[in-house]
C-alpha cells in the first residue's frame, strides 16, 4: 500500500521521461541513440517498461506501477530467502522492514530500474543459496539456468549489480 499511495502525485522527472522515451523505441534505434547520447543505463528495465506500457499505458501512475510490482515481489522473495536462512520469525521481521524501508518505498515509486535490480539480486541470492545447499546432491541444470537468468537480469537492470 505504501508504494501505491500518491504514486502519481509528482510529475515525471528527467530520468523517468528518458526511460519512457527509450522504452517506446525499437531495439536498434534505442541502441543507436543510447550510444550517440552517451547513455550508460543497461537496457533490460527499458525493454520491460516498453512491454508494460503497451499493456498498461503511459500515464505517470501506470509506468510507475511496474516498479511497485518489482518492489513488492522483492519483499516477498526477501521473506523466502530469510526464511530459508534464519527461519520464519526473522523472515517476517526482514520482510516488514523491507516493506517500509524509505529507500525501497521511494524507488518503487519511480519509473526506474532500481526495484528490478533489488528483485533480481534477491532472487539470485536465493537461487545461489539453493545451489549451495545442494553441494552433495546432483545439481539441477534448471536451477543453474534460473540462477544465470536472475543474475543477468540484475546486471541488465543496473551495472551496480556487478558489485
Specify the residue positions occupied by each region the protein language model found:
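Aromatic- and kink-enriched transmembrane "portal" helix at the membrane-lumen/periplasm boundary
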Residues: 4-9, 60, 64, 71-74, ...
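Membrane-interface alpha helices of multi-pass inner-membrane proteins
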Residues: 94-95, 107, 142-159
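Residue-level signature of transmembrane alpha-helical entry/exit and packing/kink sites
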Residues: 42, 64, 91, 114, ...
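Transmembrane-helix signature of polytopic, membrane-embedded enzymes
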Residues: 78-100, 119
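Membrane-proximal lumenal/periplasmic loop motifs of glycosylation machinery
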Residues: 4-12, 21-22, 28-64, 157
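Membrane-interface transmembrane helices that cradle and orient dolichyl/undecaprenyl
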Residues: 89, 124-146
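Transmembrane-helix motifs of polytopic, lipid-linked glycan transferases
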Residues: 65-85
